[in-house]
């Protein structure tokens, strides 16, 4: 199963992704987390692993990877491995991913499509195109799950990355923007025939009813995460998330049923 985790900036995508990944691993699933946000440098810390090498480096970096995708026949002339050539046209398994491009701990693998490391290096289009190819050709066994921690917003829908996933999980925080975005993401998910699920995050007694009423108009709410002081502190300090939270366990059970 391949699942997109999306939402507005700051809604808690990486936090929920991390907690879900760890819970699914405890359920004896083999989990792959794909860091799809070129500006996020904290997901690996939440998982308690080193930041993996940018996957674009496997294809010689952003410039060479771009030429590979845009120029017909260049694959035959480039010094790429068999997997790199197969990547653009054939299906592959989680076990085929080169081990130097992921970090791993306690049954969870983390890989990164790429990061912006310096000014004027160019946009993230190449990284996003490679991500689209990766998701399209990745095949998973029954006991394997991939969680795609997307960048904020809806651009991944425009690129077509979500065409190859099995479901969309949107994280909704208590903000007007997030509530409005839930309607848009529901429409986009429906338009490509993908199920849409929602996780309410940072919920308090004051916000619970309004969030529930608004979001439930657009799809099933499968998780309700209360505002949590310990999670907030861990996010501030960049420490590994090791807590077990009941709503996360419930969401994990829902996803694998």
Language model features with spans:
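Residues in the short beta-alpha loop(s) of Rossmann-like NAD(P)-binding domains
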Residues: 36-39, 202-204, 228
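N-terminal phosphate/diphosphate-binding loop that engages ATP/GTP or pyrophosphate donors
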Residues: 23-106
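Conserved beta-strand scaffold positions in the cores of enzyme catalytic domains, especially
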Residues: 33, 108-110, 221-224
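Walker A/P-loop phosphate-binding motif and the immediately C-terminal alpha-helix
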Residues: 2-36
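C-terminal alpha-helix
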Residues: 247-257
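C-terminal boundary of histidine-terminating zinc-finger modules
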Residues: 235-245
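Phosphate-binding/switch loop-helix module in NTP-utilizing enzymes
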Residues: 79-152
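Conserved catalytic-core segment of NTP-binding enzymes
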Residues: 19, 26-27, 125-224, 232-233
